[in-house]
């Protein structure tokens, strides 16, 4: 599955338990700015009022499973949750979580390769918890020197934070630069 990400593809399981997992490339490709990420005023007010604690990788399987619950099994099926959990166990997939005390209120997960973070999806069980995870992700990626935040497709919600579409060619150029350190270390995409 990492090889697909290195080529700019992302999975969607529309084949059910028996059919193949299909890989896609969107046009335009949705990207979220890292340095120019913006928090809408209404979201900032909500986050100040709720003060979620942001944690990373403390409940990956729970986040992935919660994200699949909103999708009616359309693309994030149990076998993809299992695949992402294996990527997490290998150090490639990560979750960013919004907590209130010991209650997981929201989160997102994605795949990190080099300075690429490819967000898959997010969920919330409390007001602004998904937004808290999104803002937490922006701060984390910025602090760790990430250069490309792939969100696959822009939605009205992500556009409020500055997400925009780029051409597949531009995406592949930015992707190549973001994953170059990993490819240099590993030798080829087939080894990752």
Region roles according to the model:
Residues 1-192:
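N-acyltransferase acceptor-side catalytic subdomain
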